[in-house]
Amino acid sequence: MTKYIFVTGGVVSSLGKGITAASLGRLLKNRGLNVTIQKFDPYINVDPGTMSPYQHGEVFVTDDGAETDLDLGHYERFIDINLNKYSNVTTGKIYSSVLQKERRGEYLGGTVQVIPHITNEIKERVYRSGRETNADVVITEIGGTVGDIESLPFLEAIRQIKSDIGRDNVMYIHCTLIPYLKAAGEMKTKPTQHSVKELRSLGIQPNIIVVRTEMPVSQDMKDKLALFCDIDTKAVIEARDADTLYAVPLSLQEQNMDQIVCDHLKLDNPAADMTEWTALVNKVRNLSKKTKIALVGKYVELQDAYISVVEALRHAGYSFDTDVEVKWVNAEHVTAENVKELVGDTDGILVPGGFGDRGVEGKIVAIQYARENKVPFLGICLGMQLASIEFARNVLGLEGANSSEINPDTPYAIIDLLPEQKDVEDLGGTLRLGLYPCKLAEETNAYNAYNEPVVYERHRHRYEFNNQFRPDMEKEGFVFSGTSPDGRLVEIIEIKDHPWFVAAQFHPELVSRPNRPQPLFHDFVRASITNKESK
């Protein structure tokens, strides 16, 4: 029978529930269990697709085209699985589904209420995740903190699941904070006690408490927490700030967290073999070289907006025993006069995805600098579109060339709406989303990176390269190295007389893994290292 683990949070948000859940998933997977994982977000948006990155961080896209929470990126990178649309559930999705059923008459004229209708829908999403993946273990992270009004239906639903399927099949893990008061020189357990008290008042008794802390937690403090929270002392797990995220599974294993979980859920799988993971962490901690890459974006104040890009750069660096330092460059501040000052000390330049016109001209200036000065360049989504516009303006001399997204009246719409998007009015969930094939041209940097004729990558865009400009740009050394199999859509572009200038319409960062870097990132970092060594 499938086992269910629920991870809740208390005291404050952003405690690392997602990393805890992902780390436990990795430990259980290495015990030979089939693990899947999901995130429940209590906000009323149907998905984060139309939310500002300042509000929510990056939007992580799954193979099947779901726009989801950035925690799913952590889940995929840690557990090395490809998640799906069932892996992220929001209050908006739940209510939308229930209201549609009510309109269809599925409730037989009954009064539709939070209990049982909303809670039943939530439970169905938990069970469906296990059914769809044939998982041995389903880990579900509940977003927000205990005590939030928005979280109450989710907490009630996961409370009911224990009654539905039995205590041996359900486990509750609660993540809290033990703050260190500098003035008093001591750590305080009271916020954790109150958080657990709140959780218990809702009918949920945690089986494990994971305490986030800056300082070591003494045995006396663990005993105190165990006493007040009514759990075994061994089930108080310390989550100290780690030098690398990938060390967290090893820290949890040292404290026997996965064994406690298996004992409770009556799983007799052998201990997790973390030899390869330990080797990875040791490698990450002992990188001997450095390279610096400029990330020119418009959300640089909130680095979570580009979290998968940064992780993909790091993964690529691990292959070369290199620590990739990211220099954050606000695209709005970049001008032709100061671009050298802002990016001249870097070994490579990356322009990530985005929407809208803010910061676009600064990104184009940075792209021009990379092209003219032979600096390795990787463009992603909007970065690919702007690389095309820069080339059209400055090489073909098409003054005013632009994207119809940015300037609907441009005389040269190098980037234009996909034909199927012309009559679309809704913004949410209407992009070209998910996994699509890309055919690579031989003897190109893209082909050399993948070494395969056809690859599959995840997309999230509404606009596309305008094919009427293909012949003129090709004549000037602009290479269309990746297209859709029918040749209609441009997927990857390159520049001929350049050491490494590649840009992709898709989002290669979404499929990178710490032990298996994404090919374009791998070769981009290699080119950046070569550039540094040649200076």
UniProtKB/Swiss-Prot annotation:
Assigned keywords, A-Z: ATP-binding, Glutamine amidotransferase, Ligase, Magnesium, Metal-binding, Nucleotide-binding, Pyrimidine biosynthesis
Top-level taxonomic group: Bacteria
UniProt-annotated catalytic positions: 381, 507, 509
InterPro entries listed in its UniProt record: Class_I_gatase-like (IPR029062), CTP_synthase (IPR004468), CTP_synthase_N (IPR017456), GATASE (IPR017926), GATase1_CTP_Synthase (IPR033828), P-loop_NTPase (IPR027417)
Binding site for L-glutamine: 54, 354, 382-385, 405, 462
Residues holding UTP: 13, 188-193, 224
Key word Magnesium present: yes
Entries under Gene3D superfamilies matching the protein: 3.40.50.880, P-loop containing nucleotide triphosphate hydrolases
Enzyme class (EC, first level): ligase
Pathway(s) where this gene product acts: Pyrimidine metabolism; CTP biosynthesis via de novo pathway; CTP from UDP: step 2/2
Positions with a binding annotation for ATP: 14-19, 71, 240-242
An example Gene Ontology molecular-function term: ATP binding
Note: CTPSs have evolved a hybrid strategy for distinguishing between UTP and CTP. The overlapping regions of the product feedback inhibitory and substrate sites recognize a common feature in both compounds, the triphosphate moiety. To differentiate isosteric substrate and product pyrimidine rings, an additional pocket far from the expected kinase/ligase catalytic site, specifically recognizes the cytosine and ribose portions of the product inhibitor.
NCBIfam families: PRK05380.1, PyrG
Protein family according to the UniProt entry: Belongs to the CTP synthase family.
PANTHER family: CTP SYNTHASE (PTHR11550), CTP SYNTHASE-RELATED (PTHR11550:SF0)
Protein name: CTP synthase
Species per Swiss-Prot/TrEMBL record: Bacillus cereus (strain B4264)
The encoding gene: pyrG
